Amino acid sequence: MGISGKLGDIASKVYEDVLMEEVKKYPRPRHVGIITDGNRRYARIVGIPENEGHVKGKNKVEEVLDWCMELDIKIVTFYAFSTENFKRSPEEVDFLFHLINDAFISLLKDERVYKNKINVKVIGNVSMLPEYLRETIKITEETTKNFSNYHMNLAIGYGGREEILDAIKRIARDAIAGKINVDEIDESKFRNYLYDGNLPDPDLILRTSGEERISNFLLWQSAYSELYFSDVYWPEFSKLDFLRAIYSYQRRQRRFGR
């Protein structure tokens, strides 16, 4: 790296430190949802195997979790594997499931989870996942179920439309069984039929890779979420990029439809 490159790194670090102090002056979002997009495109651009791009994406999740805790952002939800991802090649899907499984095993061994009391939960149709992954998820959720300082949610086998449709089916079954009166269903009761009825709506939804859509992510919950789109691919998403997203959120006036 030349002198100009080193100076650029120094300037970037100074800017990051200044922005961190500025962000800490104002209220941060309680819940951030992140669409972790761009692993494969990043891999193609830098000339590495696509699977290695996914590994770097997994590692980035751990970094961003640290940044959230540094800013005392209590809840973060990562869009890790969508229902649409099942359409990828069987080899890639199998690799991703094993990578996700390894990530949960790492979390179970990670002292940060226990020190910071991080509750880890999966939202999605877990019945679509292989048995070994379902078992690892079950162990992770059971191990962290009493932790409440921070919440890390992973949307796996998740689709927003499917979540709403599944909720409607469950309501219909309960109505037929006489457990509920359909006329009494309101937004709060409907929420109880979602994958996690206790999950607060995200204040901010952030997407990497330059795509400007939410791609079936938390459709019910994101009605009034602020949106932020970053041009960088997920594996190269930096702390400075994250701070810019939070700073942008802080500059907005949320109206909640009013």
Curated annotation (Swiss-Prot):
Binds 2 magnesium ions per subunit. Catalyzes the sequential condensation of isopentenyl diphosphate (IPP) with geranylgeranyl diphosphate (GGPP) to yield (2Z,6Z,10Z,14Z,18Z,22Z,26Z,30E,34E,38E)-undecaprenyl diphosphate (tritrans,heptacis-UPP). It is probably the precursor of glycosyl carrier lipids. GO terms for molecular function: ditrans,polycis-polyprenyl diphosphate synthase [(2E,6E)-farnesyl diphosphate specific] activity; magnesium ion binding. Homodimer. Its cofactor is Mg(2+). The lineage of its organism: Archaea, Methanobacteriati, Thermoplasmatota, Thermoplasmata, Thermoplasmatales. Substrate binds at G38, N39, R40, R41, H54, S82, T83, E84, F86, R88, R207, R213, I214, S215. This is Tritrans,polycis-undecaprenyl-diphosphate synthase (geranylgeranyl-diphosphate specific). The gene is uppS. It comes from Thermoplasma volcanium (strain ATCC 51530 / DSM 4299 / JCM 9571 / NBRC 15438 / GSS1). HAMAP family: ISPT. Mg(2+) binds at D37, E226. The keyword Transferase applies. The active site is at D37, N85 (proton acceptor). One of its GO terms (biological process) is polyprenol biosynthetic process. Keywords: Magnesium, Metal-binding, Transferase. It catalyses: geranylgeranyl diphosphate + 7 isopentenyl diphosphate = tri-trans,hepta-cis-undecaprenyl diphosphate + 7 diphosphate. It is an enzyme of class 2 (transferase). Belongs to the UPP synthase family. Its EC number is 2.5.1.89. Coiled coil: none annotated. Pfam families: Prenyltransf. InterPro entries: UPP_synth-like (IPR001441), UPP_synth-like_CS (IPR018520), UPP_synth-like_sf (IPR036424). SUPFAM superfamilies: Undecaprenyl diphosphate synthase.
